[in-house]
Structure formats: structure tokens, C-alpha cells
């Protein structure tokens, strides 16, 4: 997909008329899944004005999850053109895939790395996230296609691979690398893998997966220094490596906006606190979507954007709001992970320990449920579901998705949910 490189005025002056309050020109900052889906949704809901898309990597939009899940089996990115049929060249009037935004000015006006100054009625910030790499660390990260190529080149049978962090990415790469014959050690500072995401009680049940997959997991192992040849722990021990991967999280790519937007619109990790339609409060003509947006959910409260499902579904909410189209029900956060020979599907936002368990961890499929007080039609013995983790239960994913993405809270029959002989869909009610 070629990137246009003209310097004509943007947007042109001969734009079609639009109803009051509806933009005639839009700049989408970001050419990943959220940006591509935003362009698609705008056109699908009738936007006929001038559309500009700005990217950073110089590549057409691609899906990021396969970078880790299929690191050694997929040699090139999964292009969204092939996967979802998204062709930016046919959707947008201008596509600049290697000219990222560097500043946002009132108007709004977007300044780019090449020196362009692009004005528009609406700017949609879909600029994604960046992997966390603490100052002084010398390690690979995995976020882009270029990162994946470097990591793929460094992994080899018998080679020593040290992964710092046992979160989603760390676990997936540990399994892939061990399966390819690498000598894998995973260093996790917390008391269990995925402790921040699922809690220590649930994470403890994932510990045996590492040894079964051929990887060493070392808990309570905080990294003090990270170099290309290994990791020095806080205890002073040195863990040698041929490849070191830092998998300690990601943060919204909003650093370039700090001087442009008021401080109160940022949450503690740098996401933008938007309304249900993605609008940034107090900043006319600016909306945000995907990893950079923290949006309200009618059941879950504030939902951070660092989920693949946010990049896939939330652009539709933003486009509808921008164009004055009737809103659709909000999607709940969803994460799918294939790690260490197991499938995990997480819906919602877990907090604390699960209220209900289904099945027995370590003995076939199992699930954990996080609930709150029943409301809006709840009955005795039921509760509102705030999160569900399904482990090796692909047949239940559809039922949980339907319950979470309905018009109101999902209710769980607590007794039926704990009984694995009862179909899960019969324990859930939207």
C-alpha cells in the first residue's frame, strides 16, 4: 500500500456540505487497528468528507496479536487488508504511513514529523501504545513487526532466552520459544504470573504450565539491571542470556500530547479520559480511541483501552458519536491468549479474588468469575458479572460474549455457574 507524499493544502476547500456539528474533514492519527477501524466506521456511517490517516511505521495496517502468538510461524504481518478487508487507500483521501503526528494545536491542527500542518474539523487520536522499557535496560521488546523480526532472528534451538515479565506477552513468547527448542527462563517480580491482570490466586494456577511447556519460571525475581548478555537480579544473581525480552507492560502513546492537552484529561498511566463517544472533555474537535482512551462503561465503570477488542470495536462508537448516528451498546473488554499450550479468554475487568470457580484448575477446562451485587433485575442467588476468565473452554466464549455485550448487566446464577455439568450459557442471563 503506497503512502501519498503530496504537499497540497489539507483539507481542500471544496468539501461537501454537512449537517451542523458534523465534521467535513477528519484526521485519524494512527494507522493500526484502531485507526483503520475508525476510517472504516466513518465511511460506513456516511462520512463523505476529506479523510487523512497518519501512520508511523511505514507499513499498511496489520494485526498485532499474531506478532507473539505466531512469532515463529508467520514471517510477515497479518495485514488487515487480507484479514478484515480494510484498504486505507480506498477509504482515505490521504494516507501518510511514515509521517506520524508530533504536535496537536487548537483548531484542531496536527503537525507531523515531515513538517506538514494539517487542519481538520475533527482529529481522532488512535496512536496506540508503546512498550515499557525502563531507562538503562538493554533488551528486545515486542510491539511492532520490526520488533518481531529482530526477536525471531535472535531465537534459536539451545539458545538462552530470558523473558522479564510473566504477563500476556511474556507467557506467549515463553511458550513459543520453548516449543522451538530455546532454553527459556521467565523472571517475574510478583508472586504469580499474570498477577496484575488476574490476581495472585488465579495466577498461582498457571505456574505449572511453565514447567510443562519446557520453560523455567522464577517468581519474586526482580530485575536490577538488564543487559544484552543477561539480567542481574535484585539479589545480585546474574542470569545469562543470548536474547533478553522485556515484557513488562505498555503505556498509551500520548507523551507528544502533554503540552497540547490539559493535565486533567490524562489518567495516571497517560490514557485520555474520554466520554462514551470518545470526546476529550474541554478539547473541541478531538476524540480518542483504542489504547490511548479510557472510556466509561455502563457496568464496569472506567475501561482502559489496552485491549485488542477496544481497537476493534470502539471506533464504531466514536464514528457514530462524531456523525450524530444513534449509539450502539458498548463492548466489554476482551483478551484472548494462547500461552504455554493453553487457551485463555478474559471478559471484563477482574478486581480482587474470584467469587465463583467452575471446574478444577489443572484437571481440564475451568473458569473463574468476578461478580458484584445483583442489580437491574437480579434475583436471589444471582449476581452481576464483572469479569469471566475461561481456560481451555472455547465453546463457552460465545455465550459469555453475548452476555457481556448485551444492553444491560450480565447476571450469573451462582449455583449453576459452579456446576460444570450445567451448560454455562444456562447460568448466564443478559
Predicted regions and their residues:
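FAD-binding core/adjacent interface of flavoenzyme oxidoreductases
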Residues: 1-27, 86, 90-160, 234, ...
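Beta1-alpha1 glycine-rich phosphate/pyrophosphate-binding loop at the start
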Residues: 12-93, 176-197, 399
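C-terminal catalytic lobe of FAD-dependent flavoproteins
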Residues: 237-268, 342-430
Amino acid at each position: 500500500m503506497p503512502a501519498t507524499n503530496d504537499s497540497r493544502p489539507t483539507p481542500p476547500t471544496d468539501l461537501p456540505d454537512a449537517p451542523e456539528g458534523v465534521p467535513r474533514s477528519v484526521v485519524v492519527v494512527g494507522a493500526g487497528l484502531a485507526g483503520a477501524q475508525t476510517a472504516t466506521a466513518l465511511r460506513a456511517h456516511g462520512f463523505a468528507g476529506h479523510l487523512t490517516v497518519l501512520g508511523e511505521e511505514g507499513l499498511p495496517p496489520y494485526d498485532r496479536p499474531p506478532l507473539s502468538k505466531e512469532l515463529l510461524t508467520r514471517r510477515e504481518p497479518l495485514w488487515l487488508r487480507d484479514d478484515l478487508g480494510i484498504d486505507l487507500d480506498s477509504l482515505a483521501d490521504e494516507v501518510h504511513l511514515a509521517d506520524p503526528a508530533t504536535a496537536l494545536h487548537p483548531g484542531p491542527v496536527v503537525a507531523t514529523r515531515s513538517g506538514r500542518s494539517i487542519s481538520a474539523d475533527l482529529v481522532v487520536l488512535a496512536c496506540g501504545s508503546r512498550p515499557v522499557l525502563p531507562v538503562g535496560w538493554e533488551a528486545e521488546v515486542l510491539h511492532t513487526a520490526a520488533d518481531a523480526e529482530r526477536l525471531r532472528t535472535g531465537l534459536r534451538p539451545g539458545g538462552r532466552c530470558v523473558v522479564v515479565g510473566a504477563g500476556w506477552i511474556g507467557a506467549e513468547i515463553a511458550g513459543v520459544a520453548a516449543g522451538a527448542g530455546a532454553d527459556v527462563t521467565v523472571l517475574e517480580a510478583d508472586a504469580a504470573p499474570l498477577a496484575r491482570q488476574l490476581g495472585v490466586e488465579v495466577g498461582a494456577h498457571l505456574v505449572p504450565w511453565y514447567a510443562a511447556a519446557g520453560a523455567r519460571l522464577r517468581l519474586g525475581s526482580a530485575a536490577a539491571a538488564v543487559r544484552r548478555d543477561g539480567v542481574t537480579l535484585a539479589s545480585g544473581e546474574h542470569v545469562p542470556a543470548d536474547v533478553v525480552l522485556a515484557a513488562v507492560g505498555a503505556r498509551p502513546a500520548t507523551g507528544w500530547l502533554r503540552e497540547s492537552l490539559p493535565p486533567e484529561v490524562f489518567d495516571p498511566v497517560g490514557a485520555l479520559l474520554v466520554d462514551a463517544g470518545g470526546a476529550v472533555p474541554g478539547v473541541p474537535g478531538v476524540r480518542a480511541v483504542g489504547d490511548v482512551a479510557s472510556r466509561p462503561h455502563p457496568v464496569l465503570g472506567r475501561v482502559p483501552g489496552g485491549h485488542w477488542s477496544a481497537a476493534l470495536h470502539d471506533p464504531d462508537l466514536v464514528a457514530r458519536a462524531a456523525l450524530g448516528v444513534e449509539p450502539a451498546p458498548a463492548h466489554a473488554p476482551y483478551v484472548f491468549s494462547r500461552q504455554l499450550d493453553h487457551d485463555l479468554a478474559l471478559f471484563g475487568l477482574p478486581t480482587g479474588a474470584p467469587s465463583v470457580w467452575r471446574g478444577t484448575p489443572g484437571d481440564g477446562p475451568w473458569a473463574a468469575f468476578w461478580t458484584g451485587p445483583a442489580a437491574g433485575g437480579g434475583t436471589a442467588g444471582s449476581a452481576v458479572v464483572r469479569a469471566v476468565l475461561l481456560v481451555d473452554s472455547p465453546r463457552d466464549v460465545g455465550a459469555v460474549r453475548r452476555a457481556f455485550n448485551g444492553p444491560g448487566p450480565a447476571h450469573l446464577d451462582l449455583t449453576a455457574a459452579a456446576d460444570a455439568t450445567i451448560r454455562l450459557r444456562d447460568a448466564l442471563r443478559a
